[in-house]
Design a protein with these regions (language model features):
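Short hydrophobic/aromatic segments of transmembrane alpha-helices and their interfaces
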Residues: 3-4, 54, 131-132, 240, ...
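Hydrophobic alpha-helical membrane context
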Residues: 14-18, 69, 363
């Protein structure tokens, strides 16, 4: 871990010096970390749901800045495994434009702006898990000025971080973009509309006959204590994937609404029918204590409430991964949730979540 951090900082310094050797800047390094502790009680006919407690995420890392450059290295630990999280360098071209290169979460809809520990529903909506990508090696250009926010990304598949190219056999790639218009982004007055789109080639699969000719999509039940698959669709004979998601934020005073719709299509080879899936979620938020909701330009979304705030969140998610025309039945998911968030201080959050999840029309 020490060697990885040193390499990231060294790369940052090297790039800064090459671009402008005469620029007088100060190197600033700040440690980062996170601990997520969770406990849950379950009622289900599925024996895989066992009551318990867990530490599903622990992080340690470092952020560095030098002039117009920033870098981040983040290492995660969960259930006996160490994994690389954010590893990137970014160059600030102006107060409203930057380029980021490395392994990170690329912008695709509202949920891509917040980390896994900052989801207001405690667990991210199942539709986002099913149709979104996690961290990917690539480059992303960001434009963030006044009423407009836009990103453009190119990337390779997620397995590129874990396996050498000869082990992959082939490397999948893709591109995505997020465009947002936000005419109201003042404290207590929020309104935002946006749309994201993406294109991908088939991904790695350990089964040789499916390797880079398929997509394996799905989502777990909304808990990290017991990891149980809720919906899952394996789409063979795939040529490429396209998807898009419109988004909306509306807020007045201490009340706000967030919503997204997802559409995904896998174009397939030969005479196989294309696979189509969709989903949506809506989140109604209210601050019982803490004043009005504020806007975060950096996240392109609602800012984290102030310390001492108490928030109630009602959520509904629908995910449809069963397509009768292509004869792929990944399942249909309905989830209703209620979450209470208490923002203890700048560094600590206490959450309580109750949810009811139902799965239908799934084969396998």
């Amino acid at each position: 871990m020490k060697n990885l951090i040193s390499l990231g900082v060294f790369l940052l310094i090297l790039l800064s010096v090459q671009v402008n050797a005469q620029e007088q800047s100060v190197l600033k390094i700040r440690p980062t970390g996170r601990i997520l502790m969770d406990g849950g009680l379950f009622h289900s006919d599925n024996k895989n749901f066992v009551d318990g407690v867990a530490i599903p995420d622990a992080r340690i890392g470092v952020k560095a800045t030098y002039g117009k450059y920033k870098a981040k290295v983040d290492i995660g630990y969960a259930y006996g495994k160490v994994s690389l999280k954010d590893i990137f360098v970014e160059r600030q071209f102006s107060s409203y434009a930057l380029l980021r290169v490395g392994n990170f979460v690329h912008q695709f809809g509202l949920q891509s702006s917040t980390s896994s520990s900052m989801k207001v529903t405690m667990e991210e909506p199942a539709s986002n898990e099913a149709f979104f990508n996690s961290r990917l090696i690539g480059a992303m250009f960001v434009y963030d000025k006044n009423d407009f926010f836009g990103t453009a990304s190119v990337h390779v598949e997620s397995e590129a971080l874990k396996k050498k190219s000869n082990e992959l056999g082939k490397m999948g790639y893709g591109a995505m973009s997020r465009l947002v218009y936000r005419p109201l982004h003042d404290t207590g007055r929020l309104f935002q509309l946006g749309i994201s789109g993406a294109y991908e080639t088939p991904r790695y699969n350990s089964e040789p006959t499916l390797n880079h000719t398929s997509f394996d999509l799905g989502a777990n039940f909304p808990t990290r204590i017991a990891k149980v698959r809720a919906v899952n669709a394996l789409i063979p004979d795939a040529k490429n994937l396209i998807k898009f998601t419109p988004e909306m934020i509306a807020g007045y005073g201490p009340v706000a609404l967030e919503a997204q719709y997802y559409y995904l299509q896998v174009n397939r080879k030969k005479d196989f029918k294309n696979y189509k899936a969709s989903g949506m979620y809506g989140i109604l938020r209210g601050l019982l204590i803490g004043g009005n909701y504020r806007y975060s330009h950096t996240d392109c979304g609602i800012a984290t409430p102030d310390s001492g705030s108490l928030e109630c969140v009602f959520g509904y998610n629908y995910t449809d991964m069963s397509d009768t025309r292509s004869h792929i039945y990944g399942g249909r998911l309905n989830d209703v949730s209620f979450t209470v968030n208490y923002y203890i201080n700048k560094y600590m959050i206490w959450r309580f979540r109750y949810s009811y999840t139902k799965i239908t029309d799934r084969v396998g």
